[in-house]
Structures are given as structure tokens and as C-alpha cells.
């Protein structure tokens, strides 16, 4: 078997029997996590024609009975050949025309999937997008690592002045349309894919736009179906963070920590590829006519609230206690949590500015 991915949580292998391939995913910690994912896949495929065709079939599942992984939970899934969206974007030879076709087709299909979600809804008062956002914010605030970033009133990122995250999240509540969405929870679901990230979208045929979906996120007990779509728009930010293709600079370690510069380390063509699909790294897609033409105003705001949630969750999920300094003068460094924290600041400023003009 070929190892494809290995982490503290999961190991993923590619298995070959004769001329056929399959994928085996093993839970390294809790078997419950893999069975939660199995149950989610089964539920999605059972209740949705979209997921029935998009998610590969599970061919076996259970507890491994012998060998190194004895006692571990697993499932085996049909192998889907091809490139992921992230791999296509990171290929400098990918044609812009192909990316435009991908963008058009994938937007239509992914938006359709979240707008037609008919999964069982939850109606408890505390189950809302507002509560999810404030829960993630609370988790960040509990990490002493971010105290200085939270406590200063003004930040400067790439020569633009911003307030801190807490200011913008509090400001969201001042807009009528947001308050209305906050007060509603009839669109919240307890079943969803929740993970339309570019690494989970596979294109089986070269230069074709038909795609498959893998790795739904079974950790959510409830969420807005639009979180799945937000995860798609989070791809550019996530990939930049995951592949360490960024550099943060500041001269403020001896003073007030308030001025930062973020530089992308991707090759120019790769940046162009990502921008074709996702606009720029700071999530400034608010004037994307193709996106707006496929979403009502209400749905567009839901998407952005979920992207806010996605970014905040990203800070928590990718938190690092250590800062990796690139220069001896401690002016240039990398830290995934700080990178996402700063990107979240910029997104929230753009979002609140958009609301001021359109509320």
C-alpha cells in the first residue's frame, strides 16, 4: 500500500488489488471519529442525489483485526483518479480558460447543493451561526498567545489601518440584515458535508469540469449548510497557510505590536490561478458578479457569516505556540495562527464596509 497522508488523527493509504485501486482511511486515535464520518457519508448519499453521485462509495468498514493498526477504526472507499482543485491551481501550466470553466460549473453545483439542502433541521435557540461565531472567538481569546493582537485597538496590515477582530464582530450586530440572520436558526442543519475545500474536490478527467467530493467534516453537530460553500472560498487562504507560502514582517516587537506586512511566496502564475477562482488572498470577492448572480442578498450574507466562522475556526485549528523566525533581526517570521488572525481582520473590515454600503 502507498501512504498518501499521515497525521496524529488519521492515516490514509492507497491500496491496489489487481488493476483496481481503493483508499483506506484509518483513525489513529478514536475509532468513533471514523465511524462518525462513515455515518455522515452514508446519510449524505442516502438523502441527496447530489452527494450520491459526488461522494465515492464505501466498500468496507470496521475495526482492523490484526497487524500494526489492530483495533483501529477504518473505512475503504473507491479510489477516484485525477487532480484536486488545489493541485490544478498550483500547476503553473493550467490554462486560464480551464479555470474559468471550473469556476462557472463548480459555483453552480456547489451553490445548488447548499441551497437545496433538505437534511433534518435543529431548532434549539442556542444553535445559530451567531453562537458558533462567538464560540470560536471565545476560544481564540482564551489563548494567551493572541492577547496583544486582541488588546490593541488599531492594526496596520499592508499599509491599511484596521480595528481589531472583536471590534468588527461586535459591529456586525449593528446591521439590520445581520441581526435578522442572527435571530433565525431555521436554516441550521445537523447534517452537511461542511468541507468543500480545494483538496477535497477531485476532477477525474483532465480538462473536464465534472468533479467528486471526499472527506466530509463529521465534527460539526450543527451548522449552516452554507458553511460548506464558505470552506470552498477559504481554499486560497488555507492552501497559502498549509504550504507555508507566506511571510509576515513587522518591526514592532520592541514597541506596540500593530504594524504588519504579509507577502505571498507563491510563484506569480500560481497567484494568478488562485485569483481567477477566488479573487485575492484577502477575500475581496464582494464585487464578484458571477457569485452574486447565483445568490440572493440573504444567501450572500449567510455565505460571508460562514466565511467569518471558517476563518475564526482556522485560527483555532491551526494555532502554533512557536513563531518561526526567518531573519536574525526577528522582523520576518511565519506562524499559521497569526497569519489567519491577520487575514480574518482584513476580511472582517471588507465585510463590514460592504454592509455599510448595502444594509
Feature roles, as predicted:
Residues 73-96, 219, 308-332:
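A glycine-centered beta->alpha junction motif in the catalytic cores
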Residues 39-55, 113-116:
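Structural motif at the C-terminus of the N-lobe alphaC helix and the adjacent alphaC-beta4 loop
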Residues 8-43, 86-92:
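ATP-binding glycine-rich loop module of kinase domains
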Residues 12-16, 173-225:
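Active-site acidic catalytic loop and adjacent metal/ATP-binding pocket
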Residues 2-5:
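Protein kinase glycine-rich loop
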Residues 44, 83-185, 190-192, 281-284, ...:
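Conserved kinase catalytic-core helix
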Residues 56-73:
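Short beta-strand micro-motifs within the conserved protein kinase catalytic domain, predominantly
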Residues 211, 217-289, 309-327:
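Active-site activation/catalytic loop segments of kinase-like enzymes and analogous catalytic loops
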Amino acid at each position: 500500500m502507498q501512504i498518501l497522508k499521515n497525521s496524529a488523527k488519521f492515516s490514509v493509504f492507497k491500496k491496489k488489488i489487481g488493476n483496481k485501486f481503493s483508499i483506506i482511511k484509518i483513525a489513529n486515535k478514536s475509532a468513533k471519529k471514523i465511524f462518525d464520518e462513515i455515518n455522515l457519508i452514508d446519510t449524505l448519499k442516502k438523502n441527496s442525489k447530489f452527494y450520491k453521485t459526488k461522494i465515492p462509495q464505501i466498500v468496507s468498514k470496521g475495526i482492523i483485526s490484526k497487524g500494526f493498526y489492530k483495533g483501529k477504526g477504518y473505512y475503504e472507499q473507491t479510489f477516484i483518479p485525477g487532480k484536486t482543485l488545489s493541485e490544478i491551481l498550483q500547476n503553473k501550466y493550467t490554462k486560464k480558460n480551464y479555470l474559468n470553466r471550473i469556476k462557472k460549473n463548480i459555483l453552480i453545483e456547489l451553490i445548488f447543493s447548499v441551497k437545496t439542502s433538505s437534511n433534518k433541521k435543529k431548532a434549539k435557540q442556542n444553535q445559530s451561526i451567531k453562537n458558533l461565531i462567538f464560540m470560536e472567538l471565545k476560544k481564540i481569546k482564551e489563548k494567551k498567545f493572541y492577547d496583544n493582537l486582541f488588546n490593541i485597538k488599531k492594526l496596520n496590515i499592508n499599509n491599511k489601518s484596521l480595528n481589531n477582530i472583536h471590534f468588527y464582530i461586535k459591529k456586525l450586530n449593528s446591521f439590520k440584515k445581520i441581526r435578522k440572520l442572527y435571530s433565525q436558526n431555521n436554516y441550521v442543519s445537523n447534517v452537511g458535508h461542511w468541507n468543500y475545500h480545494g483538496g477535497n474536490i477531485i476532477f477525474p478527467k483532465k480538462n473536464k469540469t465534472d468533479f467528486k467530493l471526499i472527506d466530509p467534516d463529521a465534527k460539526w453537530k450543527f451548522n449552516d449548510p452554507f458553511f460548506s460553500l464558505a470552506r470552498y472560498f477559504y481554499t486560497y487562504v488555507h492552501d497559502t497557510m498549509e504550504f507555508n507560502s507566506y511571510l509576515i514582517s513587522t518591526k514592532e516587537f520592541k514597541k506596540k505590536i500593530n504594524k504588519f506586512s504579509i507577502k505571498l511566496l507563491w510563484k506569480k502564475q500560481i497567484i494568478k490561478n488562485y485569483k481567477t477562482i477566488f479573487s485575492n488572498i484577502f477575500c475581496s470577492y464582494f464585487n464578484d458578479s458571477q457569485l452574486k448572480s447565483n445568490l440572493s442578498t440573504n444567501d450572500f450574507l449567510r455565505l460571508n457569516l460562514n466565511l467569518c466562522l471558517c476563518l475564526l475556526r482556522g485560527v483555532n485549528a491551526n494555532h502554533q505556540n512557536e513563531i518561526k523566525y526567518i531573519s536574525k533581526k526577528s522582523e520576518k517570521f511565519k506562524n499559521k495562527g497569526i497569519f489567519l488572525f491577520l487575514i480574518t481582520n482584513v476580511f472582517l473590515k471588507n465585510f463590514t464596509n460592504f454592509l455599510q454600503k448595502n444594509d
